[in-house]
């Protein structure tokens, strides 16, 4: 019995590089939506919170620290090494410390997430309505 092998041509490095250049990075909003799916929570509220807390993704904390949710310690914004890390911290925090505890509306979340701003939930709701 004779074994025959078929040679499969491997792409050259230049061809691989060309393909890689065509792959677009996901936006922060797309990453948040995907991460919400992973954690099993709806994406509408986290997306609205991210838009509010980052000034529609224009804040320094977002641009320089990959902080998509306004997460901070002693009012100092947390910084993350990558956007993926920042998104995971934000959505994971909401999933584990809010949604898992039954806090599933902007009003319920706001009392814990941003207790200093009594208008926070109203603003989140407005952003959700605008994005529909």
Which residues are covered by each model-predicted region?
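Catalytic cores of secreted/periplasmic lytic hydrolases that degrade extracellular macromolecules
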Residues: 1-132
